[in-house]
A protein has these predicted regions:
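Acidic, glycine/proline-rich low-complexity segments that act as flexible tails and inter-domain linkers
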Residues: 1-55, 83, 109-141
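Short alpha-helical scaffolding segments that buttress acidic/His motifs in well-ordered protein cores
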Residues: 38-42, 59-66, 94-99
Length: 141
């Protein structure tokens, strides 16, 4: 399998076949070089490496995309993180950790995006108002 095919398989495993199908439908002469770069380099060469597992790569992406305040890409990578074995509690802790290092505005936006994804997937109740996860309450003292 070449790097492009490897990348497309990893992308399918990460985001799901419907995501890749939609992306392929939007392919045109202008964006084709970027899609090829993404398939071959990002997913084929980097995500395809053995040094760290896919779950850890997803965790890194959640933190990086939160720091960069990229909600659209974060939404896709939240789906990928769940597909790679991250739990809602782990995602909550990852995003809470980013608040300290990236700031509350970036983390707040990430929490909104994550909450939407988790609700869409039925992983948190639509009407939940109680804190969840380890410790549930963060004590600022």
């Amino acid at each position: 399998m070449n790097e492009r095919d490897t990348g497309r398989q990893i992308l399918t495993d990460l985001m799901g076949a419907p995501y890749l199908d939609q992306r392929d439908e939007q392919r045109n002469a202008f964006n084709a070089p970027l899609q090829d770069y993404s398939d071959e380099v990002c997913f084929g060469r980097v995500w395809g490496r053995d040094g760290i597992d896919k779950k850890l790569r997803s965790i890194l992406n959640l933190a990086i995309l939160t720091a960069l305040n990229r909600p659209a890409q974060l939404k896709h990578h939240l789906q990928g993180a769940l597909n790679n074995g991250c739990t809602p509690e782990e995602i909550q802790e990852i995003l809470l950790h980013t608040a300290v290092y990236c700031g509350l505005p970036a983390a707040g936006e990430a929490f909104k995006v994550a909450e939407g994804v988790l609700r869409e997937r039925g992983l948190i109740p639509v009407d939940s108002s109680e804190p969840t996860g380890p410790g549930a309450r963060v004590d600022a003292s």
